[in-house]
Regions:
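Secretory targeting signals
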Residues: 1-17, 42-113, 153-178
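A residue-level signal for alpha-helical anchor/packing sites in multi-pass solute transporters
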Residues: 18, 27-31, 66, 107, ...
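Residues that define the loop-to-transmembrane-helix transition and helix capping
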Residues: 39, 116-117
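Terminal transmembrane helical anchor/hairpin motif
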Residues: 119-193
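Transmembrane helix boundary and interhelical loop/hinge segments in multi-pass membrane proteins
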Residues: 13-34, 38-39, 46
Length: 196
């Protein structure tokens, strides 16, 4: 999974750079002259980047799965079938991880006009479960189940059903969708109000 995590961090940083370089190179005004509808412009830009991110996630997850199976097989570890529900859940969750991080990076870069600030905000979102762990037991469980990272890990099956932050996979997908929709909504609203 380390390779997948590295690929996800790279795609998140690339999403931030994908947005912020237009500001630095002053090509944003030209792009908006060609596509005056700002919401459509952002949606098209996000779709292009998501296609690339899905491809990168697919390659990194397949590569990590095959390399992991090869290494563990050489060590004599008995491995479950790739078609087993647990493995499919893990691979599916890992496939969602890259595009979800890319959308967070993209939305934060649009909202905050700064690549560094966008990275820090996404990093803060990723660290929220650690902050939630400071809360008392039941409150921690409740808050953690609404956070982005525990939802991703629940979707991938890496949190035990009785673990802190666990959300059933279908509900976890909903939590991820809410985070993405809210952050993208904030980004579109912010972008439409900007004086460029």
């Amino acid at each position: 999974m380390m390779g997948v995590d590295i690929a996800n961090i790279i795609t998140m940083v690339l999403a931030i750079l994908f947005v912020s370089t237009e500001r630095v190179t002053n090509t944003l005004q030209l792009s908006l002259q060609l596509t005056p509808n700002r919401a459509r412009y952002l949606a098209a830009k996000l779709c292009v980047f998501l296609l690339v991110t899905v491809g990168v996630s697919l390659v990194s997850v397949c590569f990590a799965a095959l390399c992991g199976r090869w290494v563990l097989g050489m060590m004599g570890v008995e491995l479950p079938s790739l078609a087993s529900p647990e493995v499919l859940q893990l691979l599916g969750g890992l496939l969602v991880l890259g595009p979800a991080h890319a959308v967070l990076g993209f939305a934060c870069a649009v909202t905050f006009h700064s690549g560094l600030l966008a990275f820090l905000v996404v990093f803060f979102i990723m660290c929220l479960p650690s902050l939630a762990s400071l809360l008392p037991g039941d409150l921690e469980r409740g808050v953690s189940s609404l956070l982005f990272m525990p939802a991703i890990h629940s979707l991938a099956g890496t949190i035990a059903p009785d673990g802190v932050g666990y959300t059933p996979p279908a509900l976890a997908l909903g939590v991820i969708a809410v985070w993405v929709v809210v952050l993208c909504g904030i980004a579109v609203t912010s972008f439409q109000r900007q004086d460029l």
